[in-house]
Amino acid sequence: MSDSDIPDPAQEADSRSPVSSGSGGIPATLRALKHRNFQLFFGGQLISLIGTWMQNVAQSWLVYRLTGSALKLGAVGFAGQIPVFLFAPVGGIVADRFNRKQVVIGTQIASMVLALILALLTLTRIDVWQIFVLAALLGIVNAFDIPGRQSFLVEMVGKEDLMNAIALNSSMFNGARIIGPAVAGVLVAKIGEGWCFFANGISYVAVIAGLFMMRVPPRTYRPPVGSPVTHMVEAIRWVWKTGPIRALLLLLGLVSLVAMPYTVLMPLFADKVLHGGGQALATFLKARDLGAVRLGVLMGATGVGALLGALTLASRTGVRGLGRWVAYSCGGFGVSLILFAASRNFWLSTLLLLPVGFCMMLQMSSSNTLIQAMVPDEMRGRVMAVYSMMFMGMAPFGALMGGALADRLEAPLTITMGALAAVAGAIWFGSQLPKIRVEARRLIVAQAAAGGEPSEEITARVVEE
């Protein structure tokens, strides 16, 4: 950590405590926002994520417009996410060994540069292979960004508000998921994909500026003994022998592999599968490309549901009962996807994506919260790297498999098959809950006690109803 990141006592108190004496009036749902550092992160990241979602939608539509192939859509998804599976362990080691704030600044600058290059190529003349290369490079950046950013949250708010910070972070992500796709759908239909990529590049300025303005207190850090490979193997072994975390990550990996590819196939639904809606909206917006408008609406609907799910989690003050939430939300995600795949009406499908997004976000955020509550701080970056491998690292295999199956079996049947597997996973996880709950309670109490929480408060937050 550099000297510029070590605040004096007054600065440290200001950055990790309420921003004013009146901050006690902040609603419990927003309590992490009493921390100045999290305020800076939240505001900048919200702007940046709107740009990110604009790029995600525009890139999918660009690939589909250039190729018309579900397999190529899946292949670009594979190229963009497989680096997370391969390099997230390295990213986790970096997050545990180096200044996490500086790591996140570096990844945000790299992402900005890649977005601007994609914009320049698209506004001139772009080939599909260039999209593949840039997607893969962004995936490498994400392999360092995700564990760094996830483990940096605790330094912004402390362990006492970590659960709320995770939930608000998810709320921010999905608030952007509503705005970004809607804006992208209109921009793509009116002026093309390149300007969406350019807007994303500029949006990174907000989060980078916020990170530079933070005053982060130094974290307690024990110098590592042994090689980085040894440390990563140690973390993987710890995850595997820790039953609750192993079960959460296996379920998360299953869903990412078989059910999450629905997002990759969304351009096909917008253009070929769904009918009977969107024409009036496209006419009102004076948009030439009805498919792009539909895609923006569908992705935005998922974001609305996911935002509601994240806000539901943010309203909680403890981890009690989250295991049940994981099981129920995973099952609900699968059932909602089955209904979506069966629909052929655009507006009905848009409505069905609300519970899809809601349940998806509840499972992801509840799993993240439970894992972070159980993991020791000195292993947080590496364990979150394993989380990234299961959450984002399995997705590329699912995207490639989903694209190939959709070319052979059609997109609706592909999604239905994956959704049925997600329901089966939810049933399995629910059957393991009694055993999971006992060990999870022990781990959460141990970590909370290590953070200095009174035993009666820990019991109130952890013991199942």
Ranges and model annotations:
Residues S2-E465:
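Alpha-helical transmembrane-bundle signature of multi-pass membrane transport and export proteins
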